Regions:
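Short alpha-helix capping/helix-loop boundary micro-motifs
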Residues: 29-36
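C-terminal terminal-subdomain/extension
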Residues: 1-26, 91-146
């Protein structure tokens, strides 16, 4: 998608409406947490707006592997499409299924982060990873040296 002034204005308006809704609900009930309309579980991949970051960091929208659901937050590993060449030592290629189509995706362990559930794009379907959550957690632990 091309970044234009109109696209950015639409994205900003959308984020503003989400914040207004979130704070209204939070004032009504302090224990309330945002629950996305998309049903997913740990081990699925969801499309997440990672926002604008520093150079050399992933930003904007990416499919992310959900490692851990922590009420209002998620521990995720962002992914990219598989380009030519082998993955680096901090990347891993996995097979995924989106709407019945099988493809490859490259998990980038060095970009692992905790994000708010409000960053999930519920208009996009979830992707199913053909790799077990236990194996991904093992590889993540191996990457961080645990």
């Amino acid at each position: 998608m091309e970044v234009t002034k109109e696209n950015l204005e639409v994205a900003l308006d959308h984020l503003k409406s989400q914040w207004v809704y979130y704070w209204k609900k939070k004032k009504e009930n302090p224990k309330w947490g945002y629950i996305p309309t998309l049903e997913f579980q740990e081990g699925d991949m969801v499309y997440i707006n990672l926002d604008v970051n520093f150079p050399h960091e992933m930003c904007f929208g990416h499919w992310c592997y959900v490692v851990k659901d922590m009420e209002g937050k998620l521990l995720v590993i962002p992914s990219t499409s598989v380009k030519d060449g082998c993955p680096c030592k901090y990347e891993m290629d996995i097979n995924v299924t989106l709407d019945g189509r099988k493809m490859k995706s490259r998990l980038n362990f060095s970009e692992t982060r905790v994000i708010d559930k409000m960053r999930i794009d519920c208009k996009k379907p979830k992707m199913k990873a053909e790799c077990s959550l236990v194996f991904i957690k093992y590889k993540l632990k191996e990457f961080i040296g645990g």
